[in-house]
Regions:
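Hydrophobic pocket/interface hotspot
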Residues: 30, 42-43, 50, 67, ...
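Short, low-complexity N-terminal intrinsically disordered segments enriched in polar/charged residues
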Residues: 1-44, 48, 154-162
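Short, cysteine-centered beta-strand-loop-beta hairpins and adjacent loop/turn segments enriched
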Residues: 108-117
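A short hydrophobic beta-strand element
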Residues: 97-107
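Short beta-strand edge/turn micro-motifs at domain boundaries
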Residues: 4, 121-151
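A solvent-exposed, acidic/Ser-Thr-rich amphipathic alpha-helical stretch
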Residues: 40-99
Length: 162
């Protein structure tokens, strides 16, 4: 009986570890595609009725985006702004059918001469059902940086869609 329990527990822990590694790999791959200008792989991770909340601030990325069409517009704006993102750390909790993930996400823009034009960190709180994003809320480390970067883009004549 103990051997069966140990085997079952080991299988459960191993399965969870593998699932988390697969999810992190997929997210990393989707962010790499986003950085290369293709938002579609990341968009496919959202359910059709997903909700993305990106702060109530004074910049082009703030607002509540309901549904994949609205989220696609958010991602297009991200790409058009020449932002690049990288995953710093990810924490997972809950069962696969109702998982919550916290991701430390750093955004930056590097000028052609190598100078950093913008850098900010965001915590993404993501709720999923069976690996599909149903809700995401973004918490900016420094809201003034996002607003200043958006103001600079407007000075350069880049509207919200690039």
């Amino acid at each position: 009986m103990r051997a069966w329990f140990a085997a079952g527990a080991t299988t459960a822990f191993t399965g969870r570890y593998v699932l988390l590694r697969v999810l992190l790999h997929r997210f990393t791959r989707d962010v790499a595609a986003l950085n290369a200008g293709d938002h579609r792989p990341l968009l496919s991770a959202y359910r059709h009725d997903a909700v993305l909340r990106s702060g109530e601030l004074d910049h082009r990325w703030s607002g509540v985006y309901v549904g994949r069409d609205a989220i696609e517009e958010f991602l297009r704006t991200f790409v058009a702004s020449r932002l690049r993102g990288e995953i710093g750390a990810a924490y997972f909790g809950g069962p696969p059918w109702r998982m919550t993930t916290l991701v430390r996400f750093t955004t930056h823009v590097i000028a052609p001469n190598g100078a950093v034009r913008h850098r900010n960190r965001t915590i993404l709180q993501v709720r999923t059902k069976w690996g599909r994003i149903v809700e995401q809320e973004d918490f900016y480390e420094n809201t003034a940086r996002a607003e200043a970067f958006d103001a600079r883009l407007r000075q350069l004549g880049l509207d919200a869609t690039g």
